Regions:
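Extracellular loop-to-transmembrane helix junctions
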Residues: 31, 58-83, 98-109, 151-152, ...
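Juxtamembrane transmembrane-helix boundary signature
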Residues: 43, 70-101, 110-126, 375, ...
Length: 497
């Protein structure tokens, strides 16, 4: 609801909507694909985290090829979510959370709170990656695996904070790290697959299992499924890609890449080494015209391709990690019952390289595993700063009084401290699973709301009208995604509770 204060309308921060009209500016010209490559690979780098390195291998080692027949289907669903996240930001220059507040304040704040719950446990990614450094260095000498893991986690968290503070442009820090991580991870796995005799022996069993529903029928769970693995099951679905809150961060990478109307919005820059760029409290929109329509098609075609690069790259990474698992780690599980766990969460996967190159190979895997997981923490830290700043920027008066980047860097610092505390409290696997379950719930909710936000509300409030509305093809595939995610989460609740 809105109230009248001193003759002026003051919007409600709880019961109303964020209704500030967009500024009107010209839709920028599409600069070409070479200039715009980045957000899709960043998304792939983030996605190549716990699902790809830990939980998909866990499920394949324990249950064989059953879940592989869902892999391509799982992965494809997130494509349509990313598309709609990017569409809103490209059309308005606003981050996706401003869009949530335009749907309704209650919805916006609810999504903000759930996202912050996810962020409380994000230190688990650093401690998961630190299990690899602990195994590689055996330092500090005389400490047990838990102590060494926590030591390296604390060191990594501090170093990452320093990199953030000194990096001139926040997005560039994330982009460089994620592109490096994506190619190191993918390249390392590909080399191991191509050289491994064990992989060649199982290829005839493995690749047919990737055909959707070949190995599972239409059953979501195998007959021998252990109900204790339901947290892993739902995390697996959420993280066959970025998942939940992490998907929403795609909005900010597209924005800082200056895609479409986001080119009129400033980037987050370092308070020490960067020059301030203006970030307004309201987005910008273009008006309808034949020329704008044609230019918008170019921007959306780029997004279809850019998004596809990220999804395909991440899916291929899962194929590589699960192929190595099926060839090398599943026989070991059948013989010994060994699975990734505790403070040696990444140590188990060292045999992917170890069976080829011995201790040198295991050492390389530890480094690759560290990149797999710590890059996710870097991206999440950036996401925390943007999420808090974007939500606060929907509050009247704050954009005029406080710089967006000041909020961002204060939040990055606060969550750095939180991360340093949480890695001392629980084993890394537990922390990551806590984020997975919450992210699945977030994804179920916003996927359904996108039908209203982008198909109904956006064309209504945007000066370009139906030009920015998604097509019926998108509607169909988004509906499939919403139904599937909802059913999966309902199955999780049914089995768990």
């Amino acid at each position: 609801m809105a109230t009248k204060v001193m003759g002026m309308e003051k919007e409600s921060l709880i019961l109303g909507r964020f209704k500030k009209p967009f500024d009107i500016k010209e839709l920028p010209k599409f600069p070409g694909y070479a200039a715009m490559i980045g957000p899709g690979i960043v998304w792939a780098g983030l996605s190549q985290g716990s699902g790809e390195l830990i939980w998909w291998p866990y499920m394949v080692a324990k249950y064989g090829v059953f879940f592989l027949s869902w892999l391509i289907f799982y992965a494809s669903l997130q494509y349509w979510i990313n598309l709609e996240i990017a569409r809103y930001t490209m059309a308005t220059g606003e981050g996706i959370f401003e869009g949530f507040h335009r749907v309704h304040r209650i919805y916006g704040w609810a999504m903000f709170i759930m996202s912050m719950i996810v962020m409380l446990w994000v230190g688990g990614y650093v401690s998961s990656g630190a299990t690899a450094l602990a195994a590689l260095t055996k330092f500090p000498a005389g400490w047990d695996a838990a102590g060494q893991t926590r030591f390296w986690a604390e060191v990594a968290i501090i170093v990452i904070w320093i990199i953030f503070i000194l990096g001139p442009v926040a997005y560039k820090v994330v982009e460089y790290v994620e592109i490096l991580a994506a190619f190191i991870s993918f390249g390392g796995m590909l080399i191991a697959v191509l050289l491994s005799p064990a992989v060649a022996k199982v290829a005839g069993e493995y690749f047919p299992a990737l055909i959707p529903w070949y190995a599972s029928g239409f059953n979501m769970l195998p007959q021998n499924f252990d109900a204790k693995d339901m947290n892993i099951f739902i995390t697996l679905i959420a993280y066959t890609g970025a998942g939940g809150f992490w998907n929403l961060l795609y909005s900010y990478w597209v924005r800082d890449k200056n895609a479409a109307m986001a080119a009129h919005i400033g980037r987050v820059t370092s308070p020490i080494t960067g020059e301030p760029e203006p970030i307004p409290g309201v987005g910008v929109a273009f008006t309808a015209s034949p020329e704008a329509h044609e230019e918008w098609k170019k921007w959306m075609t780029w997004q279809w391709i850019e998004n596809l690069i990220g999804v395909v790259m991440n899916t291929l990474t899962i194929v590589l990690t699960t192929l190595l698992t099926y060839a090398i780690l599943r026989p070991e599980y059948l013989a010994t019952g060994k699975l990734p766990s505790g403070f040696k969460l990444v140590v188990y996967q060292a045999e992917w390289f170890g069976h080829l190159w011995g201790d040198v190979g295991r050492g390389i895997l530890y480094i690759v595993g560290f990149f797999f997981l710590v890059d996710a923490y870097i991206t999440a830290l950036d996401g925390a700063g943007r999420t808090v700043a974007s939500n606060l920027y929907t509050v009247p008066g704050i954009p005029e009084r406080v710089e967006y980047r000041k909020i961002y860097y204060w939040v990055v610092t606060i969550f750095t401290v939180i991360g340093m505390i949480t890695v001392l409290l629980e084993q890394p696997g537990v922390l990551v699973l806590l984020t997975g379950v919450t992210n699945m719930l977030i994804m179920v909710i916003f996927t359904w709301v996108f039908f209203y936000q982008n198909f109904v509300l956006l064309p209504k409030i945007h000066p370009a009208g139906k030009i920015v509305r998604p097509s019926w093809i998108v509607l169909i595939f988004l509906l499939i995604s919403a139904i599937f995610f909802t059913y999966s989460f309902a199955l999780y609740l049914d089995v768990t509770f």
